[in-house]
Amino acid sequence: MLNPAGSKGSGLRLAALALCLSAAGCAGGARPVVTMPQAADWRIEAEQAAFVTFGDVIDIETPAGLSLWYARELKGPVAIEFDALAVSEGGANDEVSDLNAFWMAGDPHVRGGSVFAKKRSGAFAEYDDLKTYYVGIGGNRNTTTRFRRYVGEPGNRPLLPGHDLKGAENLLVPNRWTHVRLIADGRTIAVERDGRRIFALDDAQPYARGWFALRTTKSHLRIRNLRIGKP
């Protein structure tokens, strides 16, 4: 067992996760090259004791805010894709809510921009000072789906009118897999879900490098087929 950063007593069972790194085999439309990184390549920031396991599926069960960071910095252009399922099986944390992610995240207040230079508790507001792209699918207890471009200012999480979706077609369905694709390709920043582009931003000052995290709060999520490669 390991104690994740910011969460005393949280359990982490070690195994392997299939992941495609941003490598030559991922470029040019080629099938992604799948690798098996060590569990040490991941960092957990959790408000309360949480349980995360790795295998063919990443299982994340948490009673409060949790960010699961891939520890290696990514450089654009990049596409991150995965399948996700919101578990509803009667468990204590089986709330269908908050399939979220940060990508191209950096801390503008520290040299090098590392998101790990400052210890964070896993509370959502503690990420306000990052420059990052953020998507929240089924946030606010599965009532909203939103995209934001953080600007590194505490208390300021800009939200454009077209980046705040409601309606059942934009929310999570219990126990059903959904495919998510996060894109940072020069000025083109986008989120795709099940083959449909739900958010797009023409960013005149794009975040071209940074870190990726899965993010949730009081929920039980399963993640599989995670790949990081070229758009």
Regions found by a protein language model. Name each.
Residues C26-P231:
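Extracellular glycan-recognition regions
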Residues A15-A24:
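Bacterial N-terminal signal peptides
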